A protein has these predicted regions:
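Short HxH-centered metal-ligating active-site micro-motif
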Residues: 17-30, 67-69
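Active-site-adjacent mobile loop/cap segments within catalytic or ligand-binding domains
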Residues: 151, 157, 162-165, 171-183, ...
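Extracytoplasmic/secreted envelope proteins and their assembly/folding machinery
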Residues: 33-36, 148, 152, 189, ...
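Alpha-helical scaffolding within the catalytic cores
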Residues: 1, 50-51, 207-214
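Conserved beta-strand elements of the Class I
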Residues: 14-17, 225
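Active-site/substrate-binding loop(s) of hydrolase catalytic cores
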Residues: 27, 40-178, 182, 190
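Short, flexible loop segments at boundaries between secondary-structure elements
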Residues: 189-205
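Soluble metallo-hydrolase cores and metallopeptidase-like ectodomains found primarily
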Residues: 2-13
Length: 258
């Protein structure tokens, strides 16, 4: 029953940032909130930020941010099954609560979007994932979960020119989905990779299909990117926050105004 919040500012064409689709990937939220803190301060003080006068830049851009798509999953990952209320017993029965990526019902939100979902579901079953689990169970139907429905509804009700899904980890940027390659998406991805030092990549196996980025690209034929922040093992430690942020802040700003 936790709320999924969104904040927005600016005027003009809309860009979407969405974080923490997975329980252990809460550092994505902190990186983007750190970015917003510095960005909004630069706007309020009419300062330059990464060489850009941000006050002027947001006269024709609106940034919409969903800091935590999966608040229940994040709480379970950090605080255990007891934080899940009525779902506590079922989560304990599933196990691995400290390695929890799914939502409170054991559905992986980034396997629950309607893009290549049937093929992904067949692959899940082939890999023995056929019931609620800590990760990679895509549910019984696309958009079966309140989190995926909320994100899909948000996108259907807003004309976003591009979208970004922040995950961890691997220092990679995913930009296409199958045969769907929106105009300028590759060029934009190459610019983001150059600014961040991350690698443009294509997912494989159980990482293909069902994801928010996949769905956005297929549904709207507009650029969308998965940004895999940092390197290591999830959950990334909070001590990584400043290093990741400093490396990404220019890329984050350019991703909005480009």
């Amino acid at each position: 029953g936790r709320e999924i919040r969104m904040l927005s500012f600016g005027t003009g064409k809309k860009v979407l940032f969405a974080c923490a689709f997975h329980g252990m990937e809460w550092l994505t939220t902190l990186v983007i909130l750190r970015f917003l803190d510095e960005l909004l301060e630069s706007i309020s003080k009419k300062n330059f930020f990464c060489g850009i006068r941000t006050e002027n830049a947001f006269h024709n851009r609106t940034l919409c941010v969903v800091p935590c798509v999966n608040p229940d999953g994040v709480e379970i990952s950090i605080n255990g099954a007891e934080s899940a209320g009525e779902y506590c017993d079922s989560i304990k029965a599933i196990g691995s609560e400290k390695r929890w990526q799914a939502n409170a019902t054991g559905v992986d939100i980034n396997h629950n979007f309607n893009a290549g979902w049937k093929a992904l579901k067949a692959l899940e079953i082939k890999n023995g994932i056929n019931a609620p689990a800590p990760t990679r169970f895509g549910g019984k139907l696309p958009e079966s979960e309140p989190e995926s429905r909320a994100m899909a509804r948000l996108c259907r009700n807003n004309d976003f020119i591009r979208a970004f899904a922040f995950h961890s980890q691997g220092e990679e940027i995913y930009w296409s989905f199958g045969e769907y390659m929106p105009e300028n998406a590759r060029l934009q991805g190459e610019l983001l990779a150059e600014l961040s030092g991350y690698t443009m990549s294509e997912p494989d196996g159980l990482a293909v299909g069902g994801g928010f980025k996949d769905w956005f690209v297929e549904t709207f034929n507009s650029p969308a990117f998965t940004i895999e922040i940092g390197n290591g093992k999830n959950p990334l430690p909070i001590s990584d926050l400043e290093g990741i942020y400093e490396r990404l802040k220019q890329m984050l700003l350019i991703s909005i105004v480009m």
